[in-house]
A protein has these predicted regions:
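Metalloprotease/metallohydrolase-associated module, dominated by Zn2+-dependent proteases
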Residues: 1-70, 87-168
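Active-site recognition of the HExxH zinc-binding catalytic motif
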Residues: 74-87
Length: 168
């Protein structure tokens, strides 16, 4: 299954009502193609006259792997725990510290979820084959028996091409 923004929105709304008493404002929801992170939660902390508040909360879910519906749900809940901790202002011992693990264990034990901190994705199928990208390789002879090879960034190709046309 490949997640969509609409699906993530419905998951967030349902889980917020069911497990977080509806206290989490809807964050920005994004899809990513990350290979090493199935999900991320990010926000900025802003100081106000009342104290600290979080700004621009964002939950991203990777679509790189072909995850089951249950796996996507577990990833969403994992990120929502991070969001709830950030919103509450509670200081945890680390990103996956005592508070996080307590909330995760509670959801797993009480409701039968399989939320985890790490997931081995080595055997997982990807949603699509990686795109083959063309690259421009620049080769220059510096001195006899000395060469310089480099891959040219696509954004610098036109600039490099115009400068090389000036070389006699």
């Amino acid at each position: 299954m490949t997640a969509t923004i609409d699906y993530l929105t419905s998951l967030f709304t349902r889980f917020n009502d069911d497990y977080f008493d509806g206290k989490l404002p809807l964050p920005h929801l994004r899809l990513s193609r990350a290979k090493t992170r199935l999900g991320t939660f990010s926000c900025r902390k802003k100081k106000t006259w009342r104290g600290w508040r979080i700004d621009n909360p964002t939950i991203s879910i990777s679509t790189y792997y072909d995850m089951t519906e249950r796996q996507i749900q577990n990833v969403m809940l994992h990120e929502m725990i991070h969001y709830a901790i950030a919103l509450s202002g509670v200081k945890d011992t680390s990103a996956h510290g005592v508070v996080f693990r307590g909330m995760m264990d509670n959801l797993n034990r009480k409701y039968g979820w399989e939320i985890s901190i790490r997931q081995n994705t080595r055997e997982w199928e990807t949603t699509s084959k990686p795109k083959v990208r063309q690259r421009l390789i620049l080769a220059m002879r510096l001195k006899p028996n000395r060469c310089f090879l480099t891959v040219v960034s696509p954004k610098h190709y036109s600039q490099l091409n115009s400068r090389l046309s000036l070389v006699p």
